[in-house]
Each structure stands twice: as structure tokens, then as C-alpha cells.
């Protein structure tokens, strides 16, 4: 049984029952593995026990193609995207010292979606990987702008305001692409992309996303110690020798890479980066450094569950992943905002 440590604290403060980090990560890996197995076994095409056995014994058989060429890559991409969003959200919440921050606060998601919309409207969807590369390029441009700003300004409020402006600009330009698109087919494709999905993803999509996600994860991990010191206050952290400019660049660049790779792989998916850190915050003693990897695992678990729900909910047309996360994430966001307002009043 995992060793639990009871801590006292006021409700909503992020304090309570804490678990050792290795055991927490192990428990979440086991839970993610179990959910992934269920997600691979369930789908639109039901299989019998004999067909499951055939798929295990002969991966090239028709049941094997369903399991290993269609469902397994889809689950893998969902897990990678969820992990990237969860880690990015935890990093942003630690850097901005705001539990309501998420990866979209930098504007990277909006500009990345704009890149994908431009690629689709220009007819580049026929080229393999063109949409993904355009989305990642948009994320890198937005990330570079935010990194430059993070290196120049000390106030986290300036970073938030710039991210809001960048999101508004990206959204406006995407709407302009809709307005000027000469083809209703291209417009429908852009809309489908912006709603987010891991449908029809394969192992190559996972490999494309893995490189920028790995670099982003390394940068966020290197920023972990600085995020922990930042909880003491920016002035105290600076007096302790923490290089604030380097910390901001590492955290922002890592978060931008993670978010951009996630959007490139699955489209725009909201609320995962916001919700994942809150699922495990009380179990890591509200420590930003200890929060990073459990948040990544929680994000992977959330998105695999959301994709499973999108597949098994009986509808004429499969639900988009971004729709499912928004339906469940919006009430969660409202609850977090309500709890935060109570703590501010107290």
C-alpha cells in the first residue's frame, strides 16, 4: 500500500494527504496502463474473445490490424498529447504562481491552430505531415515571441497580458481564414482540426510529436527547482541566487514546445492542462517541482479516458476530443474559480 502522510491545512489550500512521489507515479502509471488496455480493447468495431486471441497471436490478421494499427496508435497519441498538456499546465501554474493558468495562457495554442488553418486553406493537406508542421511552426513563432518577452520583463502579469493578446490575435486571424476560405470543404476541415481529435492517428504521428515533446519536457524539468524556489516569492528567490530570466525562458520555451507539439498532433484541446495539475496537487504537498511528472501522467490518463468516452458514447458521428474535454472541463474550471474566489476573500 502507498505510504500516506497526513498534513493539516485549510480547505482548498492544496494541503492534505501527501504521497511519496515514486509511489504516486507508480500508481498513476498502473492506472494509465489499465485504462490504455481497456481503450485498445473497446471501440466501434466489437471483437470476440477468439478475435482478441487471433490479434495477439497474429498481429497482421484483420483483428490484429484493428488493435495494433488503429486503436493502439490512437491511444498512444492521446497519452502523449495529454502528458504534454498536463506537464505544460503544471509548469505555467508554477511560473505564474496562479492555479488557474493553463497552456493556452501563452497564446501558443491559438497561433498553432492558425498555422494548421492556413495550411488546410492553402490546400497543403494533401502533403503528408504538412498540417502538423504548420501547426508546430506557428507554435514555435508564438513561443519565440513569448520567450523574448519573458526574458525582458519581470512581472508575470505582463506575460499573461501578452498571452491574452496573442490568443486574441490568433483567434481573429483564424476567423479571417474561415471568412476568406474559398472552399466549404476546407472550412469544414479547419473546423474539425480546431475541435481536436486523435482519430486516424498512427505511429508516425506519435514519432513526429515525440521529439519536440521530449525537448520541452527536459526544459520544464530543468525549471523545476526554480519553480519550487519561486513559491517563496520572486524577491526572495532572486536574493537566493535564482536566475529569474533563465527560469522564465526555460519554463516558457518548454511549455511552448509541449503545447505546440500537442496541437500539431491532435488539434486544439482545452482544459486538460488546467485540470491535470489539480488532480494531484494535494498529493505532492503543493510543491511545483514534485507536481510536474504526476501532472503529466494525470494529463495522459485524462485524455485517454476522454478519447475512450468519445468513441463509446453512442452518437451518429464520433464526438471530437476537444468537445468532450470542454464539456467536462468547463464545470471543473468554474468550480476552481469559485474555490479560488473564496480563498481570495478569506
Name every feature range the model reports, one short phrase each:
Residues 2-346:
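Alpha-helical transmembrane segments in inner-membrane proteins
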